[in-house]
Amino acid sequence: MAVCPARFLTLNKRGFPEEVADGNCILCGHCVAVCPHDALAHSGLPQEPFLPAARKLPGPAVIDSFLIGRRSVREFTDQPIARRTLEALLEVARRAPTASNSQKLHWIVVGDRVKVHALSLKAMNWLQTAGISPALLAQWEKGYDFILRDAPAVIMACTPADYAWGKQDSAIALTFLELAAEARGLGVCWAGYLTRVAGVYASIRQALSVPEGYVVHGGLMLGERKYSYRLVPPRNPLSVQWV
């Protein structure tokens, strides 16, 4: 009962857990997941089996090396990403934590290179109207897609516009997806230009089929990486304040 974030459970007179009458369960599943005897079930959760939690993880050195070795990849091969691979990545991302377990994320997947390039064209139309640096314009005119980098797939994260934690939940879930893609050897880069334009340009929203009342908070370009990196570049010194 101590793991229930909403304090929704209490012990009855017989010593068994029961629901608090005026409680507010957030459907996190902690109560079922923590029970060592599989004695609990939860009627409010989706009817799918609980997955076994990892019993043994790689050591901190392995995980730290994986995390700091992650790179933004902007050069992709022509190889498409299989639908089953994209679905596997989304399965990981949908289990990312959300505020109060709200799970309000909606995903948009563009898994066709031709459609991805069409999004770049539409975004470029807006960028030229809004003003773009001569250097970027010159790159575009030479055939270099600096917007979506000729990626074979793009995944965008949305939430309802009136949901206060949409940006945070999207960033966390996209990071889960990015690291899951890295673990599968894929290259990933955040789709900043497309995210920016999707927030202000109706044509992009229509092309993405963003549901009415939803906002795009972020996205990723994905593909088979053309190059691999041998080294991890240095970063600025840590800026920290201990209080």
Predicted regions and their residues:
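Acidic, surface-exposed loops and disordered segments
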Residues: M1-V243
